[in-house]
Amino acid sequence: MTTPWRSVQISDDAAGLVDSNLILNLNEPNRLGDVSWFKPGKYAGVWWSLHLQTESWAAGDQHGATTANTRRYIDFAADNGLIGVLVEGWNRGWNGDWFGWGREFEFAGASEDFDLDTLSDYAKKKGVQLILHHETGCAVSRYERQLSDAMTLAEKHGVHAIKTGYVCDSGQIQRQDVEGGPISREWHDGQWMSNHFLRVLQEAAKHRIAINSHEPIKDTGLRRTWPNWISREGARGMEYNAWGNPKNPPSHEVNLVYTRLLSGPMDYTPGVVSLKGRGDTPIPSTLARQLALYVVIYSPIQMLADLPEHYAEHPEVMPFLRAVPTDWESSQLVAGEVGEYAVMARRDRNSSAWYVGAITDEHGRQIDLPLSFLDPKRKYRAEIYRDGDDADFRSNPFAFASETRTVTAADRLQLRIAPGGGEAIRFVPLR
């Protein structure tokens, strides 16, 4: 008899929980072999505007996934060293009531105003890849019947990552074992759906495609066995700060570190530097916090979620956003308490640079940060992006400061984090 693992993590402190690899190591080793065709990195895309309702998934005058608009995002990605551009609403089937229905989605057919051939060629010339979106809208069996054709189309156009979606009310997943036959309903986290996610991964792997699942099943470390399962959502992400009532409070992202993120990476989609949701409603965050989230919340694929024009309005954040990697050689929680704050240090896998991200809940705090994680034989240039002295997520969220210092592993930094704020630091070795 084969049974699933059930695990309990016990630690003397919060860092012991965060630094544990227990869940990952309970899974079988890599079954796919060489997956070097997937490159971790950052992406932009047609997404945030849809949640703001300034553009639409559906075709028409407000359609976001047009050839011209996608080209604009490709230019932005290329100019800022991003690897990809996500396009939601690129395919046919979004018109009408797709939520919980999804029976008109076509995953191998582009919308009339989205020229996939032209855009994939343009992206390739710019050194950028398209990231396609497969939203099922509950109609999961319909997706499975198109899966091979959909992956073949994506591979043909140089796509190496697909974001899948399962927007559907609880217990309403549509299962149809025979086309035209009766439809039964499945639970989102039931056995049939668990097997569905594996079927998608396996088909995607045949085409050298990685999967970033939204509205997923919970993470149990299967990315060790199927390393093309690069990330997933699985908790309230940034989209709730567009239209949620309530929005994600500052404590939410802190709590993710000690709960959801214990199981694996999360595509949280940070970097909304406008700090505004739908109807210009304020997002509970400071500007510096949006930078810190790239280090605190781990995912090998991270989105610069805001609109290109909003980044143009905040050039002060772009040096960090261009530099911060998503692939880490080592990571450690250097300070933190459950539900209060978290300070994460990570070393870049492709250089000797270190990064620190610190976030707090609704309360401001001062943190004494020892730099003992740095190489004791080297000096570093610390590029600090912090909350301004009078920053507060409620009253002065854009108060922001940056500075540079020379430091060693023997030094300590005094972090002053505003209520709802954060701090991001890049440590670059000096010769």
Q: Can you annotate each of these PLM segments?
A:
Residues 69-89, 346, 353-362, 415-426:
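C-terminal substrate/ligand-recognition segments
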Residues 15-16, 51-54, 77, 92-99, ...:
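Flexible loop/turn segments at secondary-structure boundaries
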Residues 200, 207-383, 387-391:
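Active-site-proximal substrate-binding groove within the catalytic cores of carbohydrate-active enzymes
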